[in-house]
Amino acid sequence: MDELTIKRVKTGLADPAIGPETIALMLTDTCNLSCVYCRGGRIDEGRGKAEESELTTEELFRLFEDAAGFKVKEVNIGGMRGEPFCKKDIRLILRKIKSLGLMGSMTTNGSMLSGALAEEMSSYGWDILLLSLDAPFARLQHQLRPAVNGKEYFHNILEFLGALNDNPGSRIRILVNMVITGNNYRYFPEMVNFVNNYRNIESLNVLRLVDMGLPGYSDLQLDCGQAAEFRETLEAFKREKKVLYAGNWSSPDVRREMPAGRHTRCFTNYYILSIAANGDVLFCPQQYKAVSGLNIRDVRLRDLWLNEHFSFRKILSESAPCYGECCTILRKQNEEIYNAVCDG
């Protein structure tokens, strides 16, 4: 984690006027895939009309301009509930972010990527693309993340990555997120080989399956035997520079790995401001729960950050009940901040 981020959090704990480093924006609630472990809005469920309640392009541009003026470093376009490329004017939105000198990162399912898009995004200097890819080949990817319209799309991902490979001037950093299930864990070695074929892929982030209340969760989760087998696989690849994961995978359930008495303090909201597609402020970029009384439509960014409703940040920094379900990246960042703030 960047030392400047840690310093910003330490200062922000004492001075509420220190703004966020990152705006985590859930751009749309509409998605063109029907992933087996996702509860997001799909086009076939009538969520295509969700744009009516979402922030308009003009409102988004105002937010980005406010962010640049508030010394925000990065706009992170999330994919928790929807696919960013389903958003109207998405290409204009990405260009606007970069035109203001902001760092741009985005999570995508990859289904709407193309070689032409790789060239376009490279031309205006897009920074990071987090690609949700759970298999190194089409059949399994389409099984785990099928398209609503039934069409195959894996070739679009290959075309995008291939175009980046062929463009030595492209600086787009690709972070591949792989959710481990009983269906794909045995293909992890092939996945490592896959990411090593592409220069722009910086990391393969190994993610646990999160229980989102879906009926098929138990069928997808690793059983104890599979978890032990996968742990041995991870051990074999521990020297692989691109492979990143949290915990020791001693249990299928990450919460069982947490030692008794381990801290559950979350500092995320001191450097990340999470905003839903309709403008509501969220408690966390991983927990889609709105903070009552806070919407970016009603107030400018600087004033919103100083609102009294943000007292929830201090509560979570003392104890966060959702800490055990946190994603790999945020848990690692929280560990570093905790060590610097509480032990340093």
Predicted segments with their positions:
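The −1 position to Zn-ligating cysteines in a subset of zinc-ribbon hairpins
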Residues: 30, 34, 265, 321
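Radical SAM enzyme [4Fe-4S]-AdoMet core and its adjacent flexible, acidic
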Residues: 4, 26, 46-50, 55, ...
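Short, hydrophobic secondary-structure boundary micro-motifs
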Residues: 76, 246-247, 313-314
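Short, cysteine/histidine-rich loop/knuckle motifs that typically chelate Zn2+
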Residues: 37, 268, 324-325
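Residue-level signal for threonine
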Residues: 114, 247, 307
